[in-house]
Amino acid sequence: MNNSTNSSNNGLAITSPYKTFEVVFIVLVAGSLSLVTIIGNILVMVSIKVNRHLQTVNNYFLFSLACADLIIGVFSMNLYTLYTVIGYWPLGPVVCDLWLALDYVVSNASVMNLLIISFDRYFCVTKPLTYPVKRTTKMAGMMIAAAWVLSFILWAPAILFWQFIVGVRTVEDGECYIQFFSNAAVTFGTAIAAFYLPVIIMTVLYWHISRASKSRIKKEKKEPVANQDPVSPSLVQGRIVKPNNNNMPGGDGGLEHNKIQNGKAPRDGGTENCVQGEEKESSNDSTSVSAVASNMRDDEITQDENTVSTSLGHSKDDNSRQTCIKIVTKTQKGDACTPTSTTVELVGSSGQNGDEKQNIVARKIVKMTKQPAKKKPPPSREKKVTRTILAILLAFIITWAPYNVMVLINTFCAPCIPNTVWTIGYWLCYINSTINPACYALCNATFKKTFKHLLMCHYKNIGATR
């Protein structure tokens, strides 16, 4: 807080600069905003907790952002309201420094979370083959923890111990502001680092995100889903290993049959050489396969996803070898960056050469992936995630820009900004914490429905709300 209400030397003889009805109005408005902020962000946190469809990596970042906004609603808003209506700081220097440290740490954590959300979406869109492999809950937790720890290191020590570093406390009794903000160069530098630089980075990232998303949606619209080849020319990477002469049981005497099992794919006895799919992430709603050779035991293989097993029967005299390929696909689970997998197993005879074998595998993969391609989620899901990020980014810029512009002006001309304008600008930064939950609800129907169920106490099946 760069300027404060002037106080006398004892700081206790000051009366409020506002009239009684103005004080009542300020308290009512500020109290209402605080209450809405608290309720809204609690709804966000509870919704993510109880609704499994909201438990995605992207929403874990929103959960962290909601935690920061909740702290602002509980502490920062109410203490600043007290400071404003009374006209001086009545709680002493220790509480003042603790409040300022908490205020700036959580505010900076909000900015850091916004940066994380922007980078996460950017990598999802621009690196769909590699980034989702690294995009785990553990990684998200580490990034969130880093945002909070970095924010604490940047602000808390400087705010709490600056008076001891310089050897004197220059903040007068009855006032509460960050002491090192009296230095114009420091004020200018912190404004650049805390607002202008993050805004520039997030704006550039969003521009790339929007461009990539529009390009993808445009491409999908040009290609009718019914006529699309669900498998790209580079789908099968690497050659299928040629069958060897290991003796093992054959099929069912030339018959062709399909087996679809949920969870387990039983194997016949004997040694099997299997080409197992290497999980390689693809872009949203697409399928990719990468084959690598591995030996597998003849026991049951349990998977999280459905296992589809296709066997081509041969005469019992043929030496055969089992070949399997894992198809890694992407499902839309809210953040458009979640991989799933399906395993295709083929048994071929030793009489087939490598090219024929690979052609059979490719045809089977086409057959497997054709049906999911018809059920491809509409481009609106892609737009939903991008729209949410845009709403959060715009809310952040609109609410934080006035105060940070005033900070730069104050560096060169302190008397140019009236006290009331400072107060409004500072409050706008707080209002960002009130707006964020509304952004989630307006841009995400699942959040909106879950909020409604919670507010109306409809808890039945709330965990499955889409």
From Swiss-Prot:
GO BP, one annotated term: response to virus
Transmembrane intervals: 23-45, 60-80, 98-119, 140-162, 185-209, 388-410, 419-442
Main location: membrane
Renumbered residue ranges of the record's region Disordered: 218-320
Residues annotated with Phosphothreonine modification: T446, T450, T465
Residue ranges with Polar residues bias: 284-293, 304-313
Cysteines engaged in disulfide bonds, as pairs: C96-C176, C413-C416
Intervals, Extracellular compartment: 1-22, 81-97, 163-184, 411-418
Alphabetized GO MF terms: arrestin family protein binding; G protein-coupled acetylcholine receptor activity
Record-linked InterPro entries: GPCR_Rhodpsn (IPR000276), GPCR_Rhodpsn_7TM (IPR017452), Musac_Ach_M2_rcpt (IPR001065), Musac_Ach_rcpt (IPR000995)
Residue numbers of Phosphoserine PTMs: S232
Pfam families reported for this sequence: 7tm_1
Keywords of the record: Cell membrane, Disulfide bond, G-protein coupled receptor, Glycoprotein, Membrane, Phosphoprotein, Postsynaptic cell membrane, Receptor, Synapse, Transducer, Transmembrane, Transmembrane helix
Localization annotation: Cell membrane; Postsynaptic cell membrane
The keyword RNA-binding is assigned to this record: no
Post-translational modification remark: Phosphorylated in response to agonist treatment.
Cytoplasmic side: 46-59, 120-139, 210-387, 443-466
GO annotation, cellular component aspect: cholinergic synapse; ciliary basal body; Golgi apparatus; nucleolus; plasma membrane; postsynaptic membrane; presynapse
Family: Belongs to the G-protein coupled receptor 1 family. Muscarinic acetylcholine receptor subfamily. CHRM2 sub-subfamily.
Subunit structure: Interacts with ARRB1 and ARRB2. Interacts with RACK1; the interaction regulates CHRM2 internalization.
Main function: The muscarinic acetylcholine receptor mediates various cellular responses, including inhibition of adenylate cyclase, breakdown of phosphoinositides and modulation of potassium channels through the action of G proteins. Primary transducing effect is adenylate cyclase inhibition. Signaling promotes phospholipase C activity, leading to the release of inositol trisphosphate (IP3); this then triggers calcium ion release into the cytosol.
Record's protein name: Muscarinic acetylcholine receptor M2
